[in-house]
């Protein structure tokens, strides 16, 4: 239902939801683009905006209290009070979902954990404008809770109070935050504290199930959620936990704030102020450390987990035996401090470290590294005795490299941090019982090594099709389709026909080329009578090629007869040539009259329709491109043509 109802007997569990419904200039294209002018024209909305689930108009669970136009994008704050929502989610959750906190959590806190991890995003529904229509106060239709919103940065936070719901958004301007809270209090006073939105459990169950089904194929859901959280600037949200294993706390105590990425310095949960910490406080194990100074080191309690032991072991291993080599100002360093050495300057530092020592070949080699006399080449003519033979540089005694030892310890500490922060490692999970968040020093340190995944990839890569168990497709890569047998057969037939046509054209070209021999080159054989000697050499230019028509099945092929013109032998009288020409003229005329009749008969036979097989009603008719056999064989036709031509 769209309107709220007041029911004093219902179990009221009001919670508040807040977040950006869009971000300006973040790559949203098409109809998803919201400009500052459009949002300014649409605010304030003409009517109250409902909050539903998965854009279902019949599944309204709350209402938007306030929307402000922040510098980064429109930001909303709403209230959710649907008793059936908490009941359905609590029934669906397993007994181990809340872990050790199951005994001490209230019903409202259970609802916050469930809805935060099931519906972490919001989606704004706006009215589609016409070609010449301008936006107005009726542009916004409703706000929907969903798994992943299509717009950038549309991750929401849920909490028990409006102030706590807005607190994790660190990039929200103070003026927008104050205006949002004031407007929300006024709207809530008009609604009343007992405002609830009732739904049937069957309807709510179907909607929640459809939300899960429609997002089953979403690739890297929690990676995408984490990316959207960074885009929205959320820090310190307790209830949204992308845990790699089952359970909210993953074996940690409630006081550890396990799962909170960054806790605000003012401690919006406890109200305690951490002095001297201008940025944030990060939990590690059971003890929080501040990032007030860039040289401050994170301290950990070694009794609370394996992460503190490994971190303390690697940090203590980096203590320098020669602190003066690391101090630029000459002041001694505190035990346990370390520095980051860029890879580009590593070689220069190593060379500078070696130049402070005497040259390797300044004196004779030590006795332990002297080369025995039997290993010296016999033809070696040295100006000094064999005992004074200088050893190569790599045979000298290695000196102590304090800088290299410290860099090695630093690399070991970085490797241990990466292993400790990798939540998917079962050994780390068993040893530490929870995966602590990254400190600001660690974030800056990792940022120098590589870019974040959400910066290196585009949004289109995350929204593409993927297949479980296979590698993710690269940008611009397309899955190759299965080759069609019919298309392959057709391509083979076309290639064969092209080859046949090329061969036929080559034969005609060779036959049509004139090849004349010099007069008197070929003389008649003496054993042959003179009247037959004219056939010993036939010049190709006097041969008439017969037209070879395609032979169809059922039509007998007739041998091709070439009409040969007689050749006049060299030295013979012109009168005899006239007699031979006169005797062959009637034969040429008779064959010339017979050739058109034969060609017309073959041509008329070629245009006769080929009988097609009748389709049977009991079988499935294949398409014409499948290449079914119709009683003709192209190979036989080709062979008959070639044999008749020969």
From Swiss-Prot:
EC top class, as a word: hydrolase
Sequence motif: Nuclear localization signal, positions: 445-451
Region (Interaction with major capsid protein): 626-646
Residues marked Cleavage (site): 242-243, 622-623
Protein's UniProt keywords contain Protease: yes
Transmembrane intervals: none
Entry EC number(s): 3.4.21.97
Xref: InterPro entries: Herpes_virus_sf, Peptidase_S21
Chain intervals for the UniProt region annotation (Disordered): 421-483
Active site: residue positions: 55, 123, 142
GO molecular function, one term: serine-type endopeptidase activity
A Pfam family per the record: Peptidase_S21
Positions with biased composition (Basic and acidic residues): 452-462, 471-480
GO terms for biological process, alphabetical: nuclear capsid assembly; proteolysis; viral release from host cell
Keywords tagged on the record: Host cytoplasm, Host nucleus, Hydrolase, Phosphoprotein, Protease, Serine protease, Viral capsid assembly, Viral release from host cell
Interaction with pAP as annotated region, ranges: 336-355
SUPFAM superfamilies: Herpes virus serine proteinase, assemblin
GO cellular component, one term: host cell cytoplasm
Family to which this protein belongs: Belongs to the herpesviridae capsid scaffolding protein family.
Description of its domains: Region of interaction between pPR and pAP is called Amino conserved domain (ACD). The region of interaction with major capsid protein is called carboxyl conserved domain (CCD).
Protein name, entry field: Capsid scaffolding protein
